[in-house]
């Protein structure tokens, strides 16, 4: 039996890209700091804590900021959304020192934007694969 985790795709929401670009100007190592989280997600792990009060499967992960030489609690917060077992979206990232928390409303707005955007071809192909051939 083939492992389902080998086909997990991690996508970057526009909001996440904007946040990452802004933070990378101040924190040079942010990309290498978040890489282990991306690898965990691709391996089928779901690190962090599920955010309560949201019906969708959304997690918040603490990520160490190696540029400030403090632990995870003072580092970044990475928010990701498990749209389906094979598609995970990195939705937002922020420095704990610059933003205390992200509201459920903000998260729902990002999810709404994702759902309104063009669905990646891989997802469309999988959703259409249950149609009978003929």
Tell what function each PLM region has.
Residues 2-4, 69, 74-134:
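Enriched for short, Lys/Arg-rich terminal
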Residues 31-42, 93, 98:
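Short, charge- and proline-biased low-complexity linear segments
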Residues 1-36, 122-134:
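Arg/Lys-rich, positively charged N-terminal/basic patches that mediate binding to nucleic acids
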Residues 42-69:
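A short, surface-exposed loop/turn module that caps and links secondary-structure elements
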Residues 19-26, 44, 94-97:
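Alpha-helix C-capping/helix-to-loop hinge sites
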Residues 8, 56-57, 84-87:
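Short glycine-/polar-rich loops that comprise or flank the Walker A/P-loop
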């Amino acid at each position: 039996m083939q492992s389902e985790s080998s086909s997990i795709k991690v996508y970057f929401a526009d909001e996440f890209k904007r946040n990452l670009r802004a933070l990378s100007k101040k924190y040079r190592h942010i990309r290498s700091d978040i890489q282990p989280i991306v690898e965990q997600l691709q391996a089928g792990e779901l690190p962090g804590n599920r955010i309560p009060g949201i019906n969708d499967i959304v997690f918040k992960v603490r990520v160490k900021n190696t540029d400030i030489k403090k632990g995870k609690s003072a580092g970044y917060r990475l928010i990701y959304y498990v749209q389906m077992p094979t598609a995970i979206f990195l939705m937002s990232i922020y420095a704990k020192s610059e933003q205390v928390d992200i509201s459920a409303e903000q998260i729902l707005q990002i999810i709404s934007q994702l759902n309104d955007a063009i669905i990646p071809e891989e997802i469309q192909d999988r959703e259409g694969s249950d149609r009978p051939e003929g």
